[in-house]
């Protein structure tokens, strides 16, 4: 019985600490950058959820990679560059003022996603991040073309980049 009470007291104390840290470190306003704890927690949670969500239901990629990249370049100009910028590294004013700001597509954080995970992100979007879902306006083939084009951006990675915000 004493052991059970100790476990309950520890759980209550831990919950109190988590709530205190949560309420003091996580802000709702978008006037300043999120704190380190919030950024780490949100990024890790997002990566885990994207990995889990992309396990099934992803159609096969187009066979001709070079043609897919060329088509993806065209689509990028109309679908993605308005936020991520023409180079995928320097967001436009719209992308900079999103909260969180548009991701640097050349960053390690974005490029470490698998092709399946990137496909899932482009198709489904990321709720509350500014990343829209293209699944209702673009075909699966077009989404694969965008994924293949984004992969070509990794050669221009900028190490000083913060990287992932979506």
Regions inferred by a protein language model and the residue ranges of each:
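Periplasmic c-type cytochrome electron-transfer domains
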Residues: 4-70, 135-150, 166
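Sequence/structural segment immediately N-terminal to covalent heme-attachment motifs in c-type
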Residues: 66-89, 118-120, 166
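Protein kinase-like catalytic domain
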Residues: 84, 151-154
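Activation segment of ePK-like protein kinases, specifically the conserved APE
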Residues: 88, 127, 154-158
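Winged-helix/helix-turn-helix nucleic-acid-interaction surface
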Residues: 93
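Extracytoplasmic electron-transfer domains, predominantly the class I c-type cytochrome c fold
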Residues: 97-151
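Extracytoplasmic/periplasmic copper-protein system
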Residues: 159-166
